[in-house]
Amino acid sequence: MLSKLASLQTIAALRRGVHTSVASATSVATKKTEQGPPSSEYIFERESKYGAHNYHPLPVALERGKGIYMWDVEGRQYFDFLSAYGAVSQGHCHPKIIDAMKSQVDKLTLTSRAFYNNVLGEYEEYITKLFNYNKVLPMNTGVEAGETACKLARRWGYTVKGIQKYKAKIVFADGNFWGRTLSAISSSTDPTSYDGFGPFMPGFETIPYNDLPALERALQDPNVAAFMVEPIQGEAGVIVPDPGYLTGVRELCTRHQVLFIADEIQTGLARTGRWLAVDHENVRPDMVLLGKALSGGLYPVSAVLCDDEIMLTIKPGEHGSTYGGNPLGCRIAIAALEVLEEENLAENADKMGAILRKELMKLPSDVVTSVRGKGLLNAIVIRETKDCDAWKVCLRLRDNGLLAKPTHGDIIRLAPPLVIKEDEIRESVEIINKTILSF
């Protein structure tokens, strides 16, 4: 009875957040009828009834996307300023990536790694040469890449650095986010992620982000095998470290024989105006994690890049994935990377991001207290009042034709697809400005 009441309360809350036009058009449509396709309200109610309540989506029911735009089931068009957390950097349904997927799906989709396939090696050669690493280990999701990096770091710590077996430590930064598996939440400092899910993975330690003295103290422990860090913290609210931080990380890790692992799942692949966010300081990590835009949003593909000294510490049978390195995912990833190259999307992200931040800085400071970011990974901080907070701003942005999502309470991440043009940036800023001025 209590769970039913909670479900009804959730549905009621969703209804209150929907477009007034949606609510009026569908107020009596609590189930699909023969008169037409499902309404937004029907879709909200069905998900609430049959799906786990582990997400709190913005109430909009989308059915298609193209480039920088998405459309809901009622046909309303929106600017996409989330890009599926950066996964659709190449734009929704990019024709080259779609064509690559179609061409492969009729030939061969999955073999497992029990056999060779004719696409994996092509992908491996391409991505390792592109990023100048000896080897790549293909996986599917971003969190799998993180898990893989942790295993590689521990094995390297034992076989190369000489750490006593099962004593290896990995250091992370406060505010990190790389997924919601038990390993990932074991490094988290966000109670929403970890509270109630212990016991946690041993051998994980955290230090303040953007704090080189704290890192130096931590690395003096001879049992530390690696420091894993986001060049810009995405989920924490697009936290950009001080200039020189990544250079300092590289120097300290080298000095203390500790692996520098760059989590570029969200920041990499042109998002910040460079191929990798670490490229802003011209540093080379020992390991790089890639995902999200590695498939252009069509298919889960992730990767760990490193050199032989690290990668070859793992032998056959010691790590793998049924789907990792499958021919369909590899063909899609090749096309997704080619789009980034051929369309100069890192350069476009750099230019469009500068324009976006310049315009966002003009927003009234009594509502928007801060603007930060690099390339097209940006955020605004909302001054919370009784009548205004980040969630309410996002609801009103939706009503005005732009989709964004709060992160960490008062922060709104603004990360459109990298194919966005200047006139589209300026039109989007007009929507943001109109929305902010309405509070």
From Swiss-Prot:
Positions of modified residues (N6-(pyridoxal phosphate)lysine): 292
Gene3D superfamilies named in the record: Aspartate Aminotransferase, domain 1, Type I PLP-dependent aspartate aminotransferase-like (Major domain)
Cofactors (names): pyridoxal 5'-phosphate
Catalytic activity field: L-ornithine + 2-oxoglutarate = L-glutamate 5-semialdehyde + L-glutamate
Residue numbers carrying N6-succinyllysine: 102, 107, 362, 405
Keyword Mitochondrion applies: yes
GO molecular function: identical protein binding; ornithine aminotransferase activity; pyridoxal phosphate binding
Pathways per UniProt: Amino-acid biosynthesis; L-proline biosynthesis; L-glutamate 5-semialdehyde from L-ornithine: step 1/1
One Pfam entry name: Aminotran_3
Keywords linked to the UniProt accession: Acetylation, Aminotransferase, Mitochondrion, Pyridoxal phosphate, Transferase, Transit peptide
Highest taxon of the lineage: Eukaryota
Extent of the transit peptide: 1-25
EC number of the protein: 2.6.1.13
Location(s) in or outside the cell: Mitochondrion matrix
GO cellular component: mitochondrial matrix; mitochondrion; nucleoplasm
One example of a Gene Ontology biological process annotation: L-proline biosynthetic process
Residues with PTM N6-acetyllysine: 49, 66, 107, 362, 386, 392, 405, 421
InterPro entries for the chain: Aminotrans_3, Aminotrans_3_PPA_site, Class-III_PLP-dep_AT, Orn_aminotrans, PyrdxlP-dep_Trfase, PyrdxlP-dep_Trfase_major, PyrdxlP-dep_Trfase_small
SUPFAM superfamilies: PLP-dependent transferases
Subunit field text: Homohexamer.
PANTHER family from the UniProt entry: AMINOTRANSFERASE CLASS III, ORNITHINE AMINOTRANSFERASE, MITOCHONDRIAL
Similarity comment: Belongs to the class-III pyridoxal-phosphate-dependent aminotransferase family.
Free-text function comment from the UniProt entry: Catalyzes the reversible interconversion of L-ornithine and 2-oxoglutarate to L-glutamate semialdehyde and L-glutamate.
Record protein name field: Ornithine aminotransferase, mitochondrial
Organism: Mus musculus
